Amino acid sequence: MLYSLLYGYFNINLFQYLTFRAGLGFFIAFFLTLFLMPKFILWAKAKKANQPISSFVPSHQNKKDTPTMGGIVFVFATIVASVLCASLGNLYVLLGIIVLVGFSFVGFRDDYTKINQQNNAGMSAKMKFGMLFVLSLVVSVLLSLKGLDTFLYAPFLKNPLFEMPTMLAVGFWVLVFLSTSNAVNLTDGLDGLASVPSIFTLLSLSIFVYVAGNAEFSKYLLYPKVIDVGELFVVSLALVGSLFGFLWYNCNPASVFMGDSGSLALGGFIAYNAIVSHNEILLVLMGSIFVVETLSVILQVGSYKTRKKRLFLMAPIHHHFEQKGWAENKVIVRFWIISMLSNLVALLSLKVR
């Protein structure tokens, strides 16, 4: 909106620069989240929209009165900042907003069910995965129709591994959406544990998206160019800004949780950025914390079903370390450090090819 008005109509050249509009979007989303979140917290407490706490984690029972669904606020702030600062005629921007809203809506349904039933179960797995699958499939098909190439790239290599057939690519992208959204959802179990790794991952992906959309940088760095994708940089930075605003209230001890409304939206948008920038494989490194958390659950369930033995004291693995006596803050900060280092290594792949 501001972009179309100030650059398209008044011809203010400053608004033609992605970096300026992305920075502006960052601060708009940050301050809007800071402003709206206290009001949301008061409303959520009045409505008793509190996060049901699992009985298997007795140390978290003191969090039972903490309101949830804070993700609605930072998703809303991101959309407002994107509408103001990004070009809404860009399909990658529109699809990014659709991903944020769609995945957040599924998360909202799950949160609402948990609050109504006063347990941690939420929607049935069949309904939840069904809704996520349909949404992921629609976005993946639209990306294919847009003409996004289907080459599969590996980090630190100049050339793609191979070109996927269209149907295989769509199926692969759906898998990336589903796995990433649920991985972030599993990670969101401690104060700030999902927020900061998401910030690191989004910052890294934002750089890749910016390079992919810039003809000179992509040529210099031997990075695959994706026409028009650079505009998504504005939306990504807006989401990072809103996450910093959310973290202001989510740091330990948290005043609000993001809920599935936030974690599914984050995971879906991270997956979307990875797909359009051809970083599906590198996402394993950038989202290392999410991968480890998910693997711990898979291994725990698999081990118990096959051997009747548990590999960890509790899964996801952040609870395992809590059971071993680590303070919550120690688990959180150490996971942040791992995430930061993983993303620094991932960024090296831009130059080391």
UniProtKB/Swiss-Prot annotation:
The catalytic activity of this protein is classed by the Enzyme Commission as: 2.7.8.13
- BP GO terms, sorted: cell division; cell wall organization; peptidoglycan biosynthetic process; regulation of cell shape
Alphabetized UniProt keyword annotations? Cell cycle, Cell division, Cell inner membrane, Cell membrane, Cell shape, Cell wall biogenesis/degradation, Magnesium, Membrane, Metal-binding, Peptidoglycan synthesis, Transferase, Transmembrane, Transmembrane helix
User: Recorded GO terms, molecular function?
Assistant: metal ion binding; phospho-N-acetylmuramoyl-pentapeptide-transferase activity; UDP-N-acetylmuramoyl-L-alanyl-D-glutamyl-meso-2,6-diaminopimelyl-D-alanyl-D-alanine:undecaprenyl-phosphate transferase activity
- InterPro entries documented for this protein: Glycosyl_transferase_4, PNAcMuramoyl-5peptid_Trfase, PNAcMuramoyl-5peptid_Trfase_CS
Entry's transmembrane regions:
24-44, 66-86, 88-108, 129-149, 160-180, 192-212, 229-249, 256-276, 281-301, 330-350
Topological type in the membrane: Multi-pass membrane protein
Which leading EC class covers this enzyme? transferase
Reactions performed catalytically: UDP-N-acetyl-alpha-D-muramoyl-L-alanyl-gamma-D-glutamyl-meso-2,6-diaminopimeloyl-D-alanyl-D-alanine + di-trans,octa-cis-undecaprenyl phosphate = di-trans,octa-cis-undecaprenyl diphospho-N-acetyl-alpha-D-muramoyl-L-alanyl-D-glutamyl-meso-2,6-diaminopimeloyl-D-alanyl-D-alanine + UMP
- Per its Swiss-Prot or TrEMBL entry, what cofactor is needed? Mg(2+)
> PANTHER family attached here?
PHOSPHO-N-ACETYLMURAMOYL-PENTAPEPTIDE-TRANSFERASE, PHOSPHO-N-ACETYLMURAMOYL-PENTAPEPTIDE-TRANSFERASE HOMOLOG
Q: Which family does it belong to?
A: Belongs to the glycosyltransferase 4 family. MraY subfamily.
What function does the entry list? Catalyzes the initial step of the lipid cycle reactions in the biosynthesis of the cell wall peptidoglycan: transfers peptidoglycan precursor phospho-MurNAc-pentapeptide from UDP-MurNAc-pentapeptide onto the lipid carrier undecaprenyl phosphate, yielding undecaprenyl-pyrophosphoryl-MurNAc-pentapeptide, known as lipid I.
UniProt protein name = Phospho-N-acetylmuramoyl-pentapeptide-transferase
Which taxonomic lineage does the organism of this UniProt entry have? Answer: Bacteria, Pseudomonadati, Campylobacterota, Epsilonproteobacteria, Campylobacterales
